């Protein structure tokens, strides 16, 4: 069952009790324990795969197997009636009206039916595949850790009407997930009250989550290493004779343009966010260092052309020492803060 176009509904259902004369229509709107305490719902999720975490779109793509289970005494039958298990379309029976609120296009891969045993135990099984929204905190990118939630909410029942069992669990073989860019750790499920606005009506909610730690080795080779090579080129300009103007200016100017182009192209891989990531700080500090290096080269060229060649050479020697020291400080400030 799909709610609107963006919301996936995990529907749970209860069949009718033939001996009591109840019909499916009699049971679709009333809770099994109406007038008493809340009905207890058990949710089990098997995380089969996390195919991708998309930083730019802020979604992660999952493959899930879901089981939702609860008890309805109205559906119990004696041992001489019917088969061991009965199957019902979920639209014909009561269910706790569950939806995944961060769904962004999950697909149903199994029939939408409920299975009921003789004791009135109801189980709905479904396999889901598709994207889920996630609010990524990229301040420490690419050395960041993200919480990937699966947020389940009843859009009709409050916490006083249904509760989620402590037996609800997330099961997964984390070492077998296909995404080599991340390492994962499953968290315990948490029940909560969901509200659209402060003081509004509350709905029963249950969150499953996985902590994902980014493997930074890829970014060391694609960001830090190219940036270091560009800065090394800027540093080498200080080793040229101070009166070799074309080579020194050409080298310094090339590093500035290369660094700006590289930083812009790298930033396009991230979403439009209102803060700077650790990688952004690294690019900005490195660009500032290259601009300072260019300014030093301009000064030394100017001095060398106005009978201050000795002072120009001393400044160039100082720059040779200061440049790697400042770059080391940039790395420490950016990635160890």
Task: List PLM regions with ranges.
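Short linear sequence elements within intrinsically disordered, low-complexity coil regions
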Residues: 13, 70, 75, 197-199, ...
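A generic membrane alpha-helix/interface feature
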Residues: 67, 81, 115, 153, ...
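Soluble non-transmembrane domains of integral membrane proteins
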Residues: 19-211
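Intrinsically disordered, low-complexity peripheral segments of secretory-pathway and membrane proteins
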Residues: 19-74, 80, 268, 275-337
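Bacterial N-terminal signal peptides
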Residues: 5-15
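Generic detector of short, well-ordered, non-transmembrane alpha-helical segments enriched
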Residues: 14, 60, 144-145, 254, ...
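Channel- or pocket-lining gating/hinge segments that regulate access to a cavity or pore
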Residues: 206-326
């Amino acid at each position: 069952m799909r709610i609107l176009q963006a919301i996936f509904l995990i529907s749970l259902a209860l069949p009718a009790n033939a001996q009591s004369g109840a019909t499916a229509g009699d049971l679709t709107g009333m809770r099994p324990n109406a007038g008493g305490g809340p009905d207890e719902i058990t949710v089990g999720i098997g995380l089969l795969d996390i195919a991708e975490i998309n930083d730019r779109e802020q979604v992660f793509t999952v493959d899930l197997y879901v089981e939702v289970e609860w008890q309805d005494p109205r559906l119990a039958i004696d041992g001489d009636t019917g088969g061991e298990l009965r199957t019902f379309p979920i639209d014909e029976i009561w269910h706790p009206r569950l939806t995944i609120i961060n769904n962004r296009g999950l697909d149903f891969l199994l029939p939408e039916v409920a299975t009921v045993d003789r004791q009135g135990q109801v189980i709905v099984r479904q396999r889901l595949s598709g994207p889920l929204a996630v609010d990524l905190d990229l301040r420490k990118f690419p050395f960041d850790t993200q919480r990937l939630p699966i947020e389940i909410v009843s859009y009709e029942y409050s916490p006083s009407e249904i509760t989620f069992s402590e037996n609800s669990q997330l099961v997964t073989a984390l070492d077998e997930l296909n995404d080599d860019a991340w390492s994962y750790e499953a968290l315990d499920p948490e029940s909560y009250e969901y509200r659209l606005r402060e003081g509004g009506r509350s709905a029963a909610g249950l969150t499953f989550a996985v902590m994902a730690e980014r493997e930074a080795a890829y970014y060391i080779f694609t960001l830090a290493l190219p940036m270091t090579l560009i800065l090394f080129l800027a540093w080498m300009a200080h080793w040229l004779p101070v009166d070799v103007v074309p080579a020194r200016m050409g080298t310094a100017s090339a590093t500035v343009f290369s660094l700006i182009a590289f930083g812009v192209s790298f930033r396009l891989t991230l979403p439009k966010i209102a803060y700077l990531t650790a990688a952004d700080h690294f690019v900005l500090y490195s660009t500032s260092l290259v601009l300072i290096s260019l300014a030093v080269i301009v000064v030394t060229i100017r001095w060398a052309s106005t009978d201050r060649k000795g002072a120009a050479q001393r400044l160039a020697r100082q720059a040779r020492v200061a440049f790697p020291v400042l770059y080391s400080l940039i790395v420490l400030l950016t990635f160890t803060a």
